[in-house]
Amino acid sequence: MGNYDFTKQPSLLIQGAMDTETAYLIEHLEEHACITIGNWKFHTGFLGTKREPVIISKTFQGIVNAAAATSLALAYFKPWAVINQGIGGGHDKKFHRGDIVLGEKIVPMGAVAYAFSKEGAGIDAKGFSPLPVEIFCRETGKTKKVTEYPCDIRLLQVAEQVETKYHTGRGVIGSGDEWN
């Protein structure tokens, strides 16, 4: 597949914020090439026994970096799907270190409104509600406000069929510039 054109032919974009999330995949690429766009490096090649064409990028931490890297990759490569994977802090007791959470939906964790409290009372961490984020809807050509982003159900179903030694389960993925 030495003449595979990642800018014109279908490929899967896999992203992670840190080296610990992307290095293993990059090390296992066959026919590895690296393309630099702005401050981001995009590694192309083939993974697995079926030699799937993939693009792997380290986005760096934070939603702005992730958005920039994703936008560049979408404009340059035109992947058929994007998988964001990485290490996260879990808040669901059914998941443990090493488990794989398959996202049913993504919620913007930093977009919240807290209930008013009197001066000096502080903030009640449980007294918040999601703050809708305005996005552009391609289907209608208009903007709409959302508090969550659904994940692609077909990709979710395929991911559930992958055999792995790790525990997997569906869950909600929170995205934001917040670390614990």
Across the structure, where does each feature detected by a protein language model lie?
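Glycine-rich phosphate- or other oxyanion-binding loops that anchor nucleotides, phosphorylated ligands
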Residues: 4-8, 36-180
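Gly/serine-rich nucleotide phosphate-binding loop at the start of the catalytic core
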Residues: 9-25
